[in-house]
Structure formats: C-alpha cells, structure tokens
A protein has these predicted regions:
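Short, solvent-exposed loop/turn segments at secondary-structure junctions
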Residues: 9-12, 64-65, 94-96, 140-143, ...
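Active-site beta-strand/loop signature of hydrolases that rely on acidic residues for catalysis
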Residues: 3-9, 45-70, 137, 182-185, ...
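Surface-exposed cleft-lining segments at the edges of enzyme active sites
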Residues: 29-36, 63-67, 150-172, 202-209
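Conserved S-adenosyl-L-methionine
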Residues: 87-94, 145-151, 302-305
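N-terminal, active-site-proximal structural segment of metallo-dependent hydrolase catalytic domains
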Residues: 1-131, 198, 213, 322-323
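Active-site catalytic loop in hydrolytic enzyme cores
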Residues: 116-132, 136-191
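Alpha-helical membrane-targeting segments
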Residues: 25-30, 96-129, 156-172, 239-244, ...
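Metal-dependent phosphoester-hydrolase catalytic domains
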Residues: 142-147, 184-185, 209-231, 236-323
C-alpha cells in the first residue's frame, strides 16, 4: 500500500486548526511566522502532524523559500528533514519576494544563485535564493525529476475609484504563473506490490475555471508520458465534477478540503489513470484490467485531516495495485 498526502501550506500561516485549544497547537494560533524561531516551531508542529499520517509521498503547494513573511525558511527542505524523507524537490512558480520584483526563474529548483537572474547579486550581499511554488517529498528514492510550466491567466483590471480619468482609480491584478513538479519514484519491494516505478506530481492550478481546466490537461499530458502508474496531486481549484467531465483520469478519495474553518468544497485532488473499459463500454474486471499491461492503482482508504496551518485541510489516499 502507498499513502499519498496533499497539503496546501498557505506558506505555513497558522489557520483554523491552530485554534483548537490543544496543548500542542493552541499556543501557535495567530503566531507571527515572520519571526524565524516561530516559523520553525510552526513547521516542526506541522511535520509532527504529517508524521502521524505516515505518508509515503507528500505533495505540497503554496510553499515559501526564503520569504520574509515566513521567517526566511526553506519550508520544503525543513519538512523533509523533520520527516526523514530523503527525496525532496522545491519547484518555484516564481523567483523573488511575494511583494516586489517577481521573475521567472532560470531553473525552478532555486538551489543555486545561478538559478535566478538576480541570484548572483543577492549572493553578493549575503542573501540566499527566494521564491514560491510547489514541492514533492517522499521516502522512496527518485530516478528522475520533471518540471512543466503551465502558464498563467490573463491580467484583470478592477475599477475602485470614481474618477475614470485617474489611473489611481484602477487596480491591476496579474495572474500567477503555475507549474507542475513531477518525480519518477522507485518503489521498494513490498510497498507497492508488483509496481516498481511510480510517477507522481504536485501542482496548484489557476483560480479561474477555464484556465485551471487547460492547465490540468497540460499537466496530465506531461505526466502521462512518464513511467506509470501516475498520480497528479494538488490544489486544482476545481470541483470533482469539473475534473471528471474533462475525462483525463480517475479521481480517487473524497472529503471536503476548503475552507479549513468549515470545509464545503473539495478542490484538492488525487488523479490517477483511467480504468479501462471493454467493447461494451463497461469497466473491466480487476483481472482483465490488470492483464492489460498498463499498471493501475485503486484507492482502498482515504480521508481528510486538519492541520495547524493553512486555509485548506489535507487530503490523503491509500492506494494499491490492481490485480
């Protein structure tokens, strides 16, 4: 069995789950994570909650790297170390500060000053890489990393003032760049039955439905070209019905994930390969599906979990090979 967890970190901001009054998390409600020590305490508590679920794979979204608002912490690397997961990759949607000069990274890992067009200048004044994006963590070894840029939607202009001739009456919103980070993992004997490889990706799609649908199709198309079976995990900003109508893959798991204070929608998903059908259009039996040659996964358990951080709850799925 393989357990995968998806969690939108919301840059580690304490959320509804931090206000439950428990001894372990109550003191972190409304914590100022711009303080490095506090940021580390919040991330350490988050790691403890993740560890309780014992996932094999963790897909993260809205991850900060070196941002002032989150204590300059490399959040993905910190969580990987706390969890003892040797496989970790941060993938930047953009380099630069959250507020300020955002830019397209030369290389999305942002692991070296040369990965950012301004990286050498930052290094010269003693500053490290800075960015924002997604991440993948796993206890399984990795044989290859893959990145797919998914583009961004159109900018929008909102009129906020009364004077049509005054530029200050308008607010311009630019859509965020979206990205997918994928890994082909080597599955140890006994963890995935007969499956020895698995390709899994983490992504965070646009808030506009039409753009999110296009990005999802592009992400799945890129992932499907890697060794299967396949798992596309993350914050889609789409409902299960909106995902299923696209006919790209098969959603597994259920449970509302947003907003964390009182979840009413499921917008965080785990997508895997479509189940094959026979000439009558009906799904094949397990035996016939397994004999088709393409490895398949099915969900055997699932759930959602509230964390001390984020405006999302985490969603997890237990998967096993078919046949």
């Amino acid at each position: 069995m393989i357990r995968v967890l998806s969690l939108n970190l919301q840059h580690g901001l304490p959320g509804a789950g931090a206000g439950d009054g428990s001894a372990s998390t109550g003191s972190l409600a409304r914590a100022d994570i711009s303080d490095p020590a506090t940021a580390r305490a919040v991330m350490r508590a988050t790691a403890e909650q993740i560890a309780e679920l014992a996932p094999d794979i963790v897909a993260l979204q809205e991850v900060d790297l070196g941002q002032a608002r989150s204590g300059r912490l490399a959040q993905a690397a910190f969580l990987a170390e706390e969890l003892g997961m040797p496989t970790c990759r941060f993938c930047a949607s953009y380099a630069g500060p959250v507020v300020g000069l955002r830019r397209r990274p030369l290389r999305t890992a942002l692991s070296s000053p040369t990965d950012d067009v301004l990286g050498l200048l930052r290094a010269a004044v003693g500053s490290g890489p800075i960015g924002y994006g997604n991440a993948l963590l796993s206890r399984f070894p990795v044989s290859g990393w893959h990145v797919k840029r998914l583009g961004h939607g159109a900018s929008s202009v909102e009129k906020r003032g009364e004077r049509a001739w005054d530029p200050r009456s308008y607010h311009v919103s630019t859509a965020s760049q979206r990205i997918m980070v994928a890994a082909t993992l080597e599955v140890p004997e006994g963890a995935g039955g007969p499956i020895r490889q698995l390709s899994v990706a983490s992504t965070h799609l646009a808030t506009r439905e039409s753009m999110a649908a296009r990005q999802l199709a592009a992400a799945w198309g890129a992932l499907a070209g890697l060794p299967g079976p396949h798992l596309l995990v993350g914050d889609y900003n789409l409902s299960a019905e909106q995902v299923e109508v696209l006919g790209l893959g098969r959603t597994v798991g259920e449970g509302f994930t947003f907003p964390a204070a009182g979840p009413k929608r499921r917008i965080d998903h785990v997508l895997t390969d479509l189940w094959p059908t026979g000439p009558d259009g009906l799904p094949l039996t397990d035996e016939a599906a397994a004999a088709g040659g393409s490895p398949l996964l099915r969900a055997v358990d699932w759930g959602t979990t509230s964390f001390i951080i984020s405006d999302h709850v985490g969603t997890w799925v237990d998967l096993e090979p078919v046949g």
